[in-house]
Amino acid sequence: MQNPFVPQLVYIEPRALEYPLGQELQDKFENMGIEIRETTSHNQVRNIPGKNHLQQYRNAKSTLVIGVRKTLKFDSSKPSAEYAIPFATGCMGHCHYCYLQTTMGSKPYIRTYVNVEEILDQADKYMKERAPEFTRFEASCTSDIVGIDHLTHTLKRAIEHFGQSDLGKLRFVTKFHHVDHLLDAKHNGKTRFRFSINADYVIKNFEPGTSPLDKRIEAAVKVAKAGYPLGFIVAPIYIHEGWEEGYRHLFEKLDAALPQDVRHDITFELIQHRFTKPAKRVIEKNYPKTKLELDEEKRRYKWGRYGIGKYIYQKDEEHALREALESYIDTFFPNAKIEYFT
């Protein structure tokens, strides 16, 4: 995806128009000539066009729903943060392996919430509860928030809010390069801006509808030069023919692009490919021609939260992946911090 996301269809909850952002977005999309429909609830969007499941799925991915977030209880977001902060749900990307395939289920449309101040007030309450500890908030658990922020500027508002806080830190990750409007945000070093990166094979075969790797790396350089703490998530680390060379090439590219003066505070998060049985069913339905390897027989089973287990690589494969990636990071980014491998 080279151009910033523009929805083909917009739904608005009437209550959203009681908030300035809701009104602003309605005006914006009217001026752009985009069809706007009313929906009673952002959870009950019906009549998305399409003759069959695949058409409806693809159309849903280019549909934006403007709503009010009613649930202000934040979920946990370990290991990346204490809490997930819910500014948006859903994503315009088509990553075959994404866990949102199952958590979003029958609602793959993108939702943005306009009661931003209420969400930030709730974050402040969580910070007070945990004082004097720092509290980290993850803004990309259920969406790629950067992908829609050129339209909403919600993320920019949040970055500046956390920039003024004493005990709050914001984090998010993106596969999009449309970051220019965020470069002048007053972040005060309180927001870690992370990019999802991967071997060429994975991006080419499993990440349609996202920015190319070179564009992500270019954006990462801009972000680092704007003074943001920078991070990279390598996920999913995926075994494929020539994977050792593929991942080495990724780190060589990153090393060639990142200036030395922005390397003093870089983090890496490493996540091996995993899938659940329900995810496999949904992935094969939504992307019937995918090359993604989803063979339970080749994997080992690991129990997860809520009793839903996942299939991950065998111990020897996991060890090889971890050893290879950690050695590349050690070679090219010896001062970086590896936050976790999972």
Swiss-Prot record:
Q: Which reaction does it catalyse?
A: (5R)-5,6-dihydro-5-(thymidin-7-yl)thymidine in DNA = a thymidine dimer in DNA
GO CC annotation: endospore-forming forespore
Q: Return the EC number.
A: 4.1.99.14
Q: Which GO terms describe its biological process?
A: DNA repair; sporulation resulting in formation of a cellular spore
* Pfam family name, one: SPL
CDD domains cross-referenced by the UniProt entry: Radical_SAM (cd01335)
Which InterPro entries does the record associate with it?
Answer: rSAM, SPL, SPL_Bacilli, SPL_firmicutes
Q: What does this protein do?
A: Involved in repair of UV radiation-induced DNA damage during spore germination. Can repair thymine dimer 5-thyminyl-5,6-dihydrothymine (known as spore photoproduct (SP)) by in situ monomerization of SP to two thymines.
PANTHER family the UniProt entry points to: SPORE PHOTOPRODUCT LYASE, SPORE PHOTOPRODUCT LYASE-RELATED
Query: What is this protein's record name?
Result: Spore photoproduct lyase
